[in-house]
Amino acid sequence: MDNLFSTNHELIPKIEKEKLLKQKGICLWLTGLSGSGKTSIAKSVAKKLHSKGFITKVLDGDNIRLGINKNLSFSELDRMENIRRTAEISKLFVDCGIITICCLVSPKEKMRTLAKEIIGEKNFYEIFIATSL
């Protein structure tokens, strides 16, 4: 049986969108302890980039859990699903040439590896926020 669903959804290639926007679509994945300042840093970076003419989108783990991930608990399995869904959303923005800043605790290496695999290694920048609480 033929696959009814195409895996190639892009009518216009990412590179063409990036040329139009004059920027590269990337994901800055901010990770660190709860309360370490990930969201505050992400908002500050987004404002600074906007002032320089860049289009950004902040995906905050707390806000994502209020919407698309509201059915998930904090079990390890659900945390992995939270990361997977957020990474898939980020990839949609990245593929449109948008700088996406994700703020998630993502405490396990396998969680961050999953996000990197979904988004793409060349588009993924992991930033660990290490602050005293």
Where are the regions a protein language model picked out?
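Glycine-rich phosphate-binding loop of ATP-dependent small-molecule kinases
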Residues: 1-103, 107-133
